[in-house]
Amino acid sequence: MQERHTEQDYRALLIADTPIIDVRAPIEFEQGAMPAAINLPLMNNDERAAVGICYKQQGSDAALALGHKLVAGEIRQQRIDAWRAACLQNPHGILCCARGGQRSHIVQRWLHDAGIDYPLVEGGYKALRQTAIQATIELSQKPIVLIGGCTGCGKTLLVQQQPNGVDLEGLARHRGSAFGRTLQPQLSQASFENLLAAEMLKTDAHQDLRLWVLEDESRMIGSNHLPECLRERMTQATIAVVEDPFEIRLERLNEEYFLRMHHDFTHAYGDEQGWQEYCEYLHHGLSAIKRRLGLQRYNELAARLDAALTTQLTTGSTDGHLAWLVPLLEEYYDPMYRYQLEKKAEKVVFRGEWAEVAEWVKAQ
């Protein structure tokens, strides 16, 4: 039964998106997991806690005995059936626990008794996690070109279309602004970092990569923050700035934040609840910058937002949103970005409209 335990093995698992059957407790999995992992725990949270207390009070033998007592009979068979089904569905997968210790070996032995030989990760999640951290440190040393520009300039799409681009906002499941949330909840910080490392490893492995193309992000993307090693390199990177006409930017923002988000919410929740979720999403975004707008201006824009939502609900038109979006861009987002860009003006090496920046990036 082949085990995987070298640095190159760990990297190969991440590059190949190898299915991982993670047998840690749900609370451990939620704190951090690998991108291709599914959680089928040997013990649930309560069982794990009880075994942990027993270990501290009575030692390892007593804890092991308690674990076997808690996971026995029908419960044990149900879990074996779930692991067996996952193994059959993912014949090239691998087992994983916290450190490649007793839990994954117990599951491996029970599966063997059930007629399935399945490898495990020696070193477990901890070894994979260290590999992800080290890979990010190493790969961040390659040169970086940042794509900058005001809100609505299509920076994310430009990055997505580059073979050496990494969509940080897509990985973070957040678009990096007050209105940046998506319908997918953000990952834990460790899971986000693991996903980023896997994406960088895959991108680097599939081409002769000379430099990274990333969006000009702040340290935080929603609740996730960029790894310090990557953030430090980004502060030293050259910047290409997209400068599209205001009208083009408005078209993009209308498509992304009004048409698409309304569609996504109604698709996920149905027409009635989806509409309420969509309205709450827009109001929450505006409310998040209330202090910076000032109470009077916030109240004015919130009233315009309400009017625009009423128009959209009755006519289907999103044109009414321009009444609050345009001043929000002109008075808040654009001045804020230009101020930030002025502080790193010496790093700007190219300016142009979207297509011009895309061509310039390809030539690098």
UniProtKB/Swiss-Prot annotation:
Task: Tell me its EC number(s), please.
Answer: 2.9.1.3
Q: Provide a GO biological process annotation.
A: tRNA wobble uridine modification
The Rhodanese domain extends over 14-137
Enzyme class, spelled out: transferase
Q: Which domain of life is it from?
A: Bacteria
The positions flagged as active site in the entry are 97
The keyword tRNA processing is annotated on this UniProt entry = no
Q: Which UniProt keywords apply?
A: Selenium, Transferase
Q: Which GO terms describe its molecular function?
A: transferase activity, transferring alkyl or aryl (other than methyl) groups; tRNA 2-selenouridine synthase activity
Q: Mind telling me which CDD domains this protein's record contains?
A: RHOD_YbbB
What this protein catalyses is:
5-methylaminomethyl-2-thiouridine(34) in tRNA + selenophosphate + (2E)-geranyl diphosphate + H2O + H(+) = 5-methylaminomethyl-2-selenouridine(34) in tRNA + (2E)-thiogeraniol + phosphate + diphosphate; 5-methylaminomethyl-2-thiouridine(34) in tRNA + (2E)-geranyl diphosphate = 5-methylaminomethyl-S-(2E)-geranyl-thiouridine(34) in tRNA + diphosphate; 5-methylaminomethyl-S-(2E)-geranyl-thiouridine(34) in tRNA + selenophosphate + H(+) = 5-methylaminomethyl-2-(Se-phospho)selenouridine(34) in tRNA + (2E)-thiogeraniol; 5-methylaminomethyl-2-(Se-phospho)selenouridine(34) in tRNA + H2O = 5-methylaminomethyl-2-selenouridine(34) in tRNA + phosphate
Q: Which PROSITE patterns match?
A: RHODANESE_3
**Entry annotated with the keyword Transferase:** yes
| Matches recorded under SMART domains | RHOD
- Describe the task this protein carries out: Involved in the post-transcriptional modification of the uridine at the wobble position (U34) of tRNA(Lys), tRNA(Glu) and tRNA(Gln). Catalyzes the conversion of 2-thiouridine (S2U-RNA) to 2-selenouridine (Se2U-RNA). Acts in a two-step process involving geranylation of 2-thiouridine (S2U) to S-geranyl-2-thiouridine (geS2U) and subsequent selenation of the latter derivative to 2-selenouridine (Se2U) in the tRNA chain.
Q: How does it assemble?
A: Monomer.
Query: What family does this chain come from, according to its entry?
Result: Belongs to the SelU family.
Protein name listed in UniProt: tRNA 2-selenouridine synthase
Provenance organism: Escherichia coli O6:K15:H31 (strain 536 / UPEC)
